């Protein structure tokens, strides 16, 4: 895994599936939850557009799973709003995307 949050969630990404287009990096990530969410999900995958030049990201697709590591029944799928987000300083998301940018520039 790449990093772990304070509450024990682990974040991964598939290095061999990273794609670059212009200044953007596109990647599939996975979050493995320490304990199931209130909805019963144990993990989720996400497809993200990452702009390392000004450090922002846009989630393009999310898929939620009943079991750990993206296994089991899909409980929900979604396409988030088409807007950029900026990771909170010191957050696990900031650490995760910093690592992705470092490894793929």
Model region roles, listed by residue range:
Residues 1-47, 51-105:
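N-terminal secretory-pathway/extracellular module detecting exported/lumenal segments
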């Amino acid at each position: 895994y790449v990093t772990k949050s304070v509450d024990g969630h682990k974040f991964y990404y598939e290095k061999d599936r990273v794609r670059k287009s212009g200044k953007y990096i596109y990647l599939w990530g996975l979050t493995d939850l320490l304990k199931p969410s209130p909805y019963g999900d144990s993990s989720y995958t996400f497809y993200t557009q990452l702009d390392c030049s000004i450090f922002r990201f846009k989630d393009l697709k999310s898929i939620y799973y009943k079991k750990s590591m993206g296994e089991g029944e899909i409980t929900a799928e979604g396409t988030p709003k088409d807007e950029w987000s900026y990771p909170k300083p010191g957050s696990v998301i900031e650490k995760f995307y910093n690592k992705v940018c470092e490894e793929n520039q």
